[in-house]
Amino acid sequence: MNNARPIRRALLSVSDKTGILEFAQALHAQGVELLSTGGTARLLADNGVPVIEVSDYTGHPEIMDGRVKTLHPKVHGGILARRGIDELVMEQNNINPIDLVAVNLYPFAETVAKEGCTLADAVENIDIGGPTMVRSTAKNHKDTTIIVNASDYGRVIAEMQANEGSTTLETRFDLAIAAFEHTAAYDGMIANYFGTKVPAHSKDECHEDSKFPRTYNTQLVKKQDLRYGENSHQTAAFYVDTNLDEASVATAVQLQGKALSYNNIADTDSALECVKEFDEPACVIVKHANPCGVAIGDNLLEAYNRAFQTDPTSAFGGIIAFNGELDAATAAAIVERQFVEVIIAPSVSQAARDVVAAKANVRLLECGQWASKTTSLDYKRVNGGLLLQDRDQGMVGIDDVKVVSKRQPTASEMKDLMFCWKVAKFVKSNAIVYAKNSMTIGVGAGQMSRVYSAKVAGIKAADEGLVVQDSVMASDAFFPFRDGIDAAAEAGISCIIQPGGSIRDEEIINAADEHGMAMVFTGMRHFRH
């Protein structure tokens, strides 16, 4: 059975007019009758493309300042009519078939993103006729063609030219999926916006804003299927948020290597987000979602060498992230020294690509340079629900911390404290990080007891022959007891940065003073689970 459907009549009504004139001209060249509305119709007419206004076609004018334009039986009957079934009804009601609809919707997201947008502004940018036509056409995809993305104009014209003015069922079905995805995302945005409006306490206002809507709607697009999930018995896929354009593992382009695994993607995200914290040339090496080596240097090669030195054992099979262009010398140092799963950087020089190409299995990613960080939400799934929170973008500078000990940190200690605090933010709690000269000396991650995380950091440093004496220490949360301070002093730590806030803060500070250590409070915690 031939599933091709000829395009003889099309309705074009778009807010974003990118490419619509050229598309209309191509349809006209194929002998297609064009219907249109408002600004789209004027654009076509002004450029010599024959077009029939929908109001003339239906015999009913646009009313209510354009709120009612296409909501008419001649429009929706023409779209929804089943070919070979509804011809008699169409004839009785003077309805002609409409074979193609190209629609994109009022810019609701752009409107509500504007500073000073009112509820009234938002309401006027809720499209009614557009989504209705989109859904009608997509529902009847067996016979009609829907286009919601300008990027599909050329595809449809090419298919018509190759098929005597017709489209195939395969194409119509694919476009219908895109259409339903489009309207689902649109309605989700509207529901999210309205869901943040809660009854106001003021008599003069009907609502005030809440950060979290009553229902949360989001749409993620599948980027790739994965070989398996966290474990080989789990199936998995990678979905991305196309509304966020910050350089990330989601936007990264893979230049070479084996396909990314579930764990590769998760660990690469951890490494990249950590290295973004640094302005100086920096390298972060991650293993099982925890930084095992972090350092800054005069250049990326020095930063990598120092980061690797922290824990060469754990770096084996790790993920390496940089905050600058990967050069040939740094790439050579990596592939000649260690087995690595993934290397990611904002950009990769051609010489570096050539070096890494010798190791065909190494996954090399280029993510683009980040100018700023996007304000967004973090998700954590629990059985039967989803936890939403602000992304942890909190960070402190030298002017934000409070020295609580008798001894003041030296300038070099304070610099190391700032470095160490940035790293601790990305270590699984309980997190303890030892550092010296802008290089991690030991990392204690994920222990149920904070004092044991401190002990682990010391053990890691000792195993690699690194000297803890006169290093600084960061703790992602406050110390509940002085035992962590005593353990740090015994290891040779000279200075500690921590949030503070324990009911035993005075005892903790006294312990630091007893050991002649400097201690600063950040007033900010960085739990990471």
Swiss-Prot record:
Gene3D superfamilies listed in its UniProt record: 3.40.140.20, Methylglyoxal synthase-like domain
A Pfam family hit: AICARFT_IMPCHas
SMART domains according to UniProt: AICARFT_IMPCHas (SM00798), MGS (SM00851)
Matching CDD domains: IMPCH
Record flagged with keyword Membrane: no
UniProt-listed InterPro entries: AICAR_Tfase_dup_dom_sf, Cytidine_deaminase-like, MGS-like_dom, MGS-like_dom_sf, PurH-like
Pathway: Purine metabolism; IMP biosynthesis via de novo pathway; 5-formamido-1-(5-phospho-D-ribosyl)imidazole-4-carboxamide from 5-amino-1-(5-phospho-D-ribosyl)imidazole-4-carboxamide (10-formyl THF route): step 1/1; Purine metabolism; IMP biosynthesis via de novo pathway; IMP from 5-formamido-1-(5-phospho-D-ribosyl)imidazole-4-carboxamide: step 1/1
Disulfide bond annotation, renumbered to this chain: none
Domain notes: The IMP cyclohydrolase activity resides in the N-terminal region.
NCBIfam families linked to this entry: PRK00881.1, purH
Stated name of the protein: Bifunctional purine biosynthesis protein PurH
Organism phylogeny: Bacteria, Pseudomonadati, Pseudomonadota, Gammaproteobacteria, Alteromonadales
Gene field: purH
